[in-house]
């Protein structure tokens, strides 16, 4: 891979440092060593010691996080960690912090992402993946022995487990499996949730962990979809419906799927805690003229957007129930007292969820990013759809959404015309 200089120097309070990737083989023999000729330019904060090797490692790791497809950078992180361990072996005065152990553990876990590119042998790939994840968790454990109270290492453990479940285990599963005792994925997921800890100086890592959890829930929730699609494609009857796949009681994912509501509730609660922590510790202490590209501002808006999307996700089921009973059923069912009561219950559940979604999507708005305005408008349309037909609340919602879409459409020279037309053509 060709070398490239990677600078993070958007801030005037940063200075650049070139770090040579070491030539030696990894002490564990895990990674092919890059050439010493490769030098990577990293950016350090102005108040950090550019000669401090742990500072350089942190800068190298943060550079990789901005370019996670760059295996050269990742190999450089692992080799630098190995080198620092060897230095410590020869000099007992060298202290390796909890941050060192966290970076090393995360880097070992990240190496698994590149394994599909290295071999097509599934058995060998699984063995290598198992080695890397075991090494990552062992590095976490060694760090936790030295720093037992650090939230950073607890978050690191959660992150590694949430990577391992889909990459190593779910990738091996089929809908026909009945080997829950082999993987014990429910217990593994619960252990990841238990080790999650929010720390005021680890907001970005906490958000990354919660995003991984969100992605994992989506993978588990849609696990059967691929099998259903493949069965449908194999069918000779074009009119034949897809056959629903039902997992066996002893399938490794069954217990997790039965507890999806609790998992989404856990995700929502921890995203809210993270959002509120940043709001109180940062946003309430800065002025309105804060740079929109400030890392904490970007993170805050990303969390708000994720919360908005999550609330819309949680509103999907009651919204669907309401729409089916009120608009997709026959006239007799629409006047049935029991069906109407069920529709009203679904409506009362969905409306507050969509209102929360709108609130957080508004927090996520960026003045010069029209898509963030449209996200709000589409949520307002969803809210309008939940109000009684042709009610004042419904008409007001559609009007609000129309005003936002007109502004966004004008700013983007017609990019959102289809959405706008669909709104204006509502019966």
From Swiss-Prot:
It is found in: Nucleus. Residues 1-37 are annotated as: Disordered. It comes from the Eukaryota. Keywords: Nucleus, Transcription, Transcription regulation, Translation regulation. GO terms for biological process: positive regulation of SREBP signaling pathway; regulation of translation. The keyword Transcription regulation applies. Its main location: nucleus. It holds the Pfam family Nro1. One of its GO terms (cellular component) is nucleus. Disulfide bonds: none annotated. InterPro entries: Nro1/ETT1. Belongs to the ETT1 family. Required for correct translation termination and probably involved in regulation of hypoxic gene expression. This is Enhancer of translation termination 1. It comes from Kluyveromyces lactis (strain ATCC 8585 / CBS 2359 / DSM 70799 / NBRC 1267 / NRRL Y-1140 / WM37). The gene is ETT1.
